[in-house]
Amino acid sequence: MQPIEQPGTGPDDITPESQDTNTAESAESGAETGHPRRIRSFVRRAGRTSTGQQRAINELGPRFQLPYTTEPLDWDAAFGRAGAKRIFEIGFGMGETTAHIAQLRPDDDFLGVEVHEPGVGALLKLIGEREIGNIRIVSHDAVEVLAQMIPEGTLDGIHVFFPDPWHKKRHNKRRLIQSPFVARLAAHLKPGGYLHCATDWEEYAHQMLEVLSSEPTLENTADGFAPRPDYRPVTKFEKRGLRLGHGVWDVVFRKRG
């Protein structure tokens, strides 16, 4: 089945009606045709890469973008250091949140996965402007990156911020945060590693909480929804939504061990 063409926005451009590229097509759910679907971490969306974004890709891509391969990633070689915590982000939108967190946590290494070229260019532009050295980018389906490049039990954290809510009920099965995929994510965490999801779609927030709570290898860090961790910034679109009375929910679980 081909990826569904649908516009969207990332964690730096969020409303309940318009979210980022993350989605899921679950083999357990099945397609409308009756055939099983594989999990896919994105939808294609239209968007023009600006001159500045393209320049950043051309000039900074060779240093900060990593090719997708079917071999395990050598983090130490990719980041030029050893011993840093390893954080994996699925779908970083236009990259403002990723850049902010990486600056706030310079001792951690961040691998962001995003297929939307304008978003990749935007994050590379921020990397150059702010002289950020602890981010690397892979432009590929995050599900395949996780399966092929990230060995199990090697991640200190996973971020999934504002995935597509697929708010129509008949599309709910396309959501990324479902039990089979969460089990995969948990398998790639180290004991004590965390999985942090955030959404501004309340019904999806409750689904996230239910799904993560049902994963036996994970435990909640809070009684229900978590307070927003200090490292996750409030974006301008989130502020606008909060002024309009829209909520934002964070769910943070840790790997038992």
Curated annotation (Swiss-Prot):
It comes from the Bacteria. It holds the Pfam family Methyltransf_4. The keyword Methyltransferase applies. It is an enzyme of class 2 (transferase). One of its GO terms (molecular function) is tRNA (guanine(46)-N7)-methyltransferase activity. GO terms for cellular component: tRNA methyltransferase complex. Its EC number is 2.1.1.33. The keyword S-adenosyl-L-methionine applies. Residues 36-47 have a biased composition (Basic residues). Residues 1-58 are annotated as: Disordered. Belongs to the class I-like SAM-binding methyltransferase superfamily. TrmB family. Catalyzes the formation of N(7)-methylguanine at position 46 (m7G46) in tRNA. This is tRNA (guanine-N(7)-)-methyltransferase. The lineage of its organism: Bacteria, Pseudomonadati, Pseudomonadota, Betaproteobacteria, Burkholderiales. The gene is trmB.
